[in-house]
Design a protein with these regions (language model features):
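Extreme N-terminal starter segment of soluble prokaryotic enzymes
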Residues: 1-5
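Extended, H/D-rich, highly charged conserved domains that either
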Residues: 162-165, 170-252, 257-258
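Active-site nucleophile/metal-coordination loop of metallo-enzymes that catalyze phosphate/sulfate
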Residues: 11-156, 194-196
């Protein structure tokens, strides 16, 4: 088998889907390529042009034309919401399931009970009537404040005090009982629980979590894994090819969100 490359240009869209006005009002005019060309009409991307970028776009610019030798196509997404993680999973072979969208408040009790069932120490942290979970003294489980609110939960820890592997075990237990799109497990070294407490924020009176950047988790030794709702890695291209003895290399962001 010759080398095969999947290049993901995240957010580099070529137009809106038919239901954009209904499902995401304001996005019905989304056209990243068109917007870039409007401001930079002289932009020239020869490799993408040769591969069929303008063929898929359906029109040409002053510098980039349709390619006679290109095999090209375009597809509407099947997953729900604007979610880069599920977009990657869909490209790799996952049939998306519709996740729930709700604050961690609605999941706190079931998450706490499930963790206790497996022998973990669990404390409920409450601020201004909102709750989140502290597990084994060093792992917070709360709302993600960076994506659309209610789409994801974060599992955050300072990795000088607990291993990433143990944090992932906790994350998998959370994933077993919640139906939001993603459970994001991450941490770094060099920070402490004091940094996490200082990064605690409340949004819209409904969501409480640890602001990722303020937690200092990104500064040193950052590790992260995204656990998607209904994602079965065994049917995805990287695992299938690996099982066939074909080497697969994940480079960049995709290495964090595709297994």
């Amino acid at each position: 088998m010759k080398r095969f490359v999947v290049l993901v240009l995240d957010g580099f869209g070529i137009g809106a889907m038919k239901d954009a006005a209904e499902t995401r009002p304001g996005d019905e005019r989304a056209d990243t390529l068109g917007s870039i060309l409007k401001d930079f009409p002289q932009m020239n991307l020869p490799n993408l042009e040769r591969l069929g970028l303008m063929n898929a776009y359906g029109k040409e610019s002053s510098q980039m034309k349709m390619s006679d030798g290109a095999n090209f196509g375009k597809a509407e997404l099947m997953h729900f919401g604007a979610d880069t993680f599920m977009g990657h999973q869909e490209i790799m072979g996952t049939q998306p399931r519709k996740p729930a969208i709700h604050p961690f408040q609605e999941s706190a009790d079931i998450v706490a009970a499930h963790l206790r069932k497996y022998g973990h120490k669990v404390n409920i942290i409450e601020k201004q009537g909102l709750r989140y979970v502290l597990c084994d003294d060093y792992v917070t489980i709360a709302d993600n404040l960076e994506a659309d609110l209610g789409m994801c939960y974060n599992v955050t820890a300072p990795l000088d005090f607990i291993s990433f592997e143990r944090e992932c075990e906790i994350g998998r237990l959370v994933r077993e009982v919640v139906t939001v799109g993603r459970v994001i497990v991450f941490g770094g070294i060099g920070n402490t629980m004091a940094d996490l407490w200082n990064a605690e924020e409340i949004r819209n009176g409904q969501f409480i979590g640890i602001a990722s950047a303020k937690s200092r988790s990104y500064e040193r030794g950052y590790q992260c894994i995204h656990m998607g709702y209904g994602v079965d890695e065994s049917v995805q291209v990287p695992v299938c090819l690996t099982d066939m003895g074909i080497a697969v290399t994940l480079i960049g962001k995709v290495a964090d969100i595709v297994q």
